[in-house]
Amino acid sequence: MICASKITMLGLLVMCTLGGVLGKVDIRQTTANKAFMETMRADGYEVVHPFQIRDKNERIGIDTRNYFLKAQEHYSHVTIVIRSNQLGRLKLVLERNNFIFLNQTAFHKLDADGERVIQNRVENCYYQGTVGGEESSFVALSSCNGLRGVISFANGTTFGIWPLDGGDRNSRRHPHILYKSEWSQEAKCGSSMAHAVGQRRMKKHVHKHRSHHHEHNKKRDVSKRTKYVEVALIADYEFMKARGLHDLDAISYMLESLNIADSMLSRDLNIRLSAVYVELWTDVQRIDLWEDIERTLSGVVDYASGHIYHIQKDASILFTAGSFANQEVSNAAIRSICTARSAVIVKGVEQFATHWNGELLAQSIGHLLGLEHDTTACSCEPSPECVMRQQPGRVGGGGGSPFSWQFSKCSVARMHGIWQDGNIQCLLNKPFQVSELRECGNGVVDGSEECDCGSRENCQDPCCDPLTCTLRPHAQCAAHHKCCHRCELRKAGDTCRSSKSPCDVAEQCDGKSGDCPPDGHLIDGTVCGTDGQCWRGNCSDSHQQCQKLWGREARVAEPVCFEQNTKGAEYANCGQRQADGTYHPCQIEDTRCGTLHCHSGSITPIDSSLKAFTFHFTENSHQIQCKSIASAAVGLTSDGTNCASGRVCVAGSCVEMSSVSSATACPTNNLALLCSGHGHCTTTARCVCFNGWSGVACDIRSNSSTYQGSMGFGEEGSGGSSQKSSERKTIMIPHLNIGTTLETATLFAILLGFGVFLLLCLVCLMLCYRRRSVVEIPKPSDEKDEESPDRQIKFGNMPSYREEKRKRKSNKKIYGALNRITEADERDSTSLRSRDSAGGSQQLVDRRNGAPVVVGGIRDPYAGEHIYAESSSNHLTRQFRGINSDGSYPLRSFGSWRSSAPISPASSSGQLTDVSTATTPLRLNKIGKFLKTLQSDDESPSPFSDHQSFTTGIGIGARLEQMQFGGGGDEELSAVEADHDVGSNTESSRGCEEPMDPGSWDSPTLVNGASSSSTSNNYNFRQSPSLFSDPFKLEMTNSMHN
C-alpha cells in the first residue's frame, strides 16, 4: 500500500507537470524509477524541470555536451536553473572537474577471461560549484545521463537530485526528482580502532620517505599550494553484483563519489583527488570480506601491494557492498598516505545517493593524511556537523543526521601543521607527472636514485655519477645532502638545520646518513614569549603581535575591547566572508580569537598602508583604549594564541588544544609528565632537557645540559608514554642557551686552547733567553790588531797546592779567611781587567817631554792610567828615589818587569808616573795599618825616575818574597786574625808587617840567578808566588812577555 501510494502521488505530480506532452509515457512502470521511488518519503520530494543557460541567456536542455567540438566533450562551465516550490529559483554555477580522471587513466575489468581494458569511453561530465555563487553552499553533480548529485547549504539542509527515465534529455522539460536528503541507517567509521596502530606504523615510514624528498623539497609553507592525491579505484565483486554487473553504472557511482569528496577537500584543504586507475571485479571476490573491517583493510593493502604495485598512486580505494560489525562502513590507515599501506575501504551505503559515499570517502582521505575525528569542541559553523565526525550516520530523534561537507577548524589547523612538517611532499606533483620525474638526469632524486645532479653537461656534483644517478666509488654521500662535506659524511653532532624561532629546535647529523633528520619543533602549547605559547614551531604571543603592529610600547587591550567582536563590524569581527565581503560576528566564546585589540604604542600602525581604528570608552570610571586593524590577514588574533585554559585560537575560533594538536609520546619515567617533567617534548618525540638534567628522558641530574630555559618556558603537565626506542638522543637548542653552563666539548676546546697558549709562551721565553745568552762583549780594536793567531801561552812550572791543602785541613778557620780574601781578590782582578780593556787606547807618556813611550814597537795600553789599587812594592819604590837604572823606563807588567826604552843618566832623578807592579802577598797582621798608608799615597803619588830606585824596587820585591816564605805559621795566623778584625779583603790592603830598611835591598834577587851587577838592559823579574791563583794576571803577563 505504501509503495502504491508513493507511485500514485508521483504519477499525479508528473501528469500535472507534464500535461499532455508526456501523457502517453507511463513513467510509473519504469524499473529504475520504481526502484528509486521506493526509497523516497511521500512528503520529501518534488518533480522539477531544470534547464541550462548558455550565452545570451539562451535556455537549452540539461545536456552539457559540446556538440560543436566533440560529441563526448562537455562544457567547462555551465549554469543550471532549477525552479522549486520549496526553495524557489536555484541558480547552480558549475565548473567541470578536470582532475577527476585524465586521458591516461586506465579502466580495467577482471572477469573469467582475465584482465581486459574497458573499451567504452568514459565521459568527464562531473561538475562542482555553488548556488548563485554563494560560498556557503555546496553543489556537486554529474550530467552524463541527466543531473545526479547533491545541493547543500551552510545550515546543513541538503537536497539530492535524480533524473527520471523517460522524456527527451535534450529538451527543457526533462523531469528530475528534488528531494531532501538524510541518513537512513546507522553508520560509523572504523578508523578510530586503528588509530594507535596506524600512527605507529606511519612514524616508521615518515623518515624513510622524507629521506628521498625533503632535501629537495625544502621545508616551506605549502598550505596555499594545491595538493594532488592520485587514487586507484577498485570495485569488488559484491559491489558489482549490487549494480547488476553494469560496468558504466559502477564506474559512474565511484566517480560521482570521488567528485563529491574532491569538492569537500578542495574547498577547505586545497586537496584534489584524481583517479589514475579503475578496476572492476566481475567474476570472483579477490579479497576476503571479514566482519572485522580492520582485517579486511589488511587484505586490501596486500592486494594493492601485490597486484597493482606497478600503478603509481598515493592511495588505493576499495568499494564494496559487504557488511561489517558495529555498523562500520569505512576504514583507513591513519597517516599512511604515500606509503604501501595507504588504503581505504568504503561501503556503498546508498544505491541512489552517492553523496553519502562521497562524505565517507572524504573522511577516509583525511585519515590517510593524518586527520583524526573531531571532538565536541570542534565545530564548523553554521553547519551542525563536520566531515571528520566519528559517526556519520545516525537514525532517530525525528530524522537522520544531515549531510556534512565542511571540515572543522580543528581539522584545518591540523592539516596546516601537517603541511608545515613537510611530511607529505609526494602530493605536490600533478597526476601522471611521476613518470616524467622518475628519470635520471632531471635533477630530482626519486625512485631508487642515490643522487641526481642533472645532465652530464650541467652536473656540478663531484660525488654523483650523472649517467647512472648513483654515488661515485669514493663517495659516501652526495652534495645535495645536508650532512655531506666533500663526499664524506659529516661527524655526528654537526648542526645541519638551525633553529628558526624560539619554538624551533636545531637538527644535528647522526654521522651515519647524509640526510638531515626530520625537521621538528617544540610541541604545541609549550610556553614562550611574554604570554604566548608555541604553535606549529612559532611563538604565538598577542603582546608581540601588538608590538609588531603598533610599536614596542603596545600591549594587549582590556578584555572588554574583545567583547566588541560580537558586533561583526569592520573594526571588530571574527573574519570576513569572501563572497560578499561582510564580516562574521564572533560567538561569545570566540571573542578572544577575533580582531586583535591593543592599547598604547604609536598613534598610527607601523605599516601606514593598513586601515586602523581607535576608539575609547569609559567603564567604571576607567578610560579604556581599543586599537584594531581592519584586515583579516594581520588584524585577527594569530592562530595558536591562548584563548582559555587548554584552548587555542584557530581561524577565529577558540577550540581545545587536544582537538587540533596531535599528542606526541616523548620518553619519560613518569607517565603523568612528558620528558619526566624536566624538559620539553618535540614533534619528533625527543626531549629537550632543562638546565641540570640530561638523558633520553631528562631523568639524570648533571652539571651541564643542552638546554637552559629562556622565553619563560614552563613545565608541561600533559601525559605521555615511554615506549620509545633507546636510540633517541637529547638534542640542543642553541638559541636558548643563555646560562653559564658550558658543553663538555666547549670546555675541552677552551682547555686545549689554553694549553697551546702556554706552549707558545714557553717557546717565546726560550728564544728570548737564547738570544740574550749568546751576546758577546767585543774586544778592543787594538787588542784584536795586536793578537797573533800563532800566539802560545806558556804556564811554566805551576806551584803545587798539596801543602796548601794539608794546611787547609789542619786549620780550616785560617783557610776560610783566606778564601774570603781570594774571592775579594778575584773581584778586584775582574774590575782591573775591565779598566785595562777600557784604557787600551792610552799611551805611556814621558814626563820629560810628554811623548808617548813605545816599548818594542808596541804602545803600552796602560801608560798614564790611574792606579785603582797600587801594590806595596810600587809604594816602597817611591820611597827610594835615589836608585838609578841603566836608562830604561820600567813598564808595568803582571808577574815581571822589563825595560826597553833607554834612559840617560841625567834623567835618573826624574819620576815615572802611573807605573805599578804586580801584587805580592804580604804579611797579613798589619793589613789595617798598611791600608792607611796606601790610601795616603794614592792621593799624592810620587814617581821614581832613576835607575837606582828601579833596582831598589827590584830588591823590595825579592825581599817581600823572602819574607813571605820565611815567616812561621804563627805569624800567618796572627795576620789572618788581624785581617779578620780590620775587615779588609782587597789587594790594596795587603801591606808589610813593618817598614823595611832600604839598605838591606842593595842586592836584589834577579830572575834565573842573575847577579845584581849585571849590566843587561832587559830585566825579567820573577814575582813571588801568590797564595791565590789569578788566571787573568797570568794571561796578561804572558801577553806582555810575548
Swiss-Prot record:
Record Gene3D superfamilies: Collagenase (Catalytic Domain) (3.40.390.10), Disintegrin domain (4.10.70.10), Laminin (2.10.25.10)
Segments on the Extracellular side according to the record's topology features: 24-746
Domain of life from the UniProt record: Eukaryota
Annotated SUPFAM superfamilies: Blood coagulation inhibitor (disintegrin), Metalloproteases ('zincins'), catalytic domain
Glycan attachment positions: 103, 155, 538, 703
TM region(s), chain numbering: 747-767
One Gene Ontology biological process: plasma membrane fusion
Compartmental location: Cell membrane
Record key words, sorted: Cell membrane, Disulfide bond, EGF-like domain, Glycoprotein, Membrane, Signal, Transmembrane, Transmembrane helix
Peptidase M12B domain ranges (all copies): 227-431
Signal peptide annotation: 1-23
Region (Disordered): 779-809, 825-850, 980-1028
Start and end residues of each EGF-like domain: 662-699
Record protein name field: Disintegrin and metalloproteinase domain-containing protein unc-71
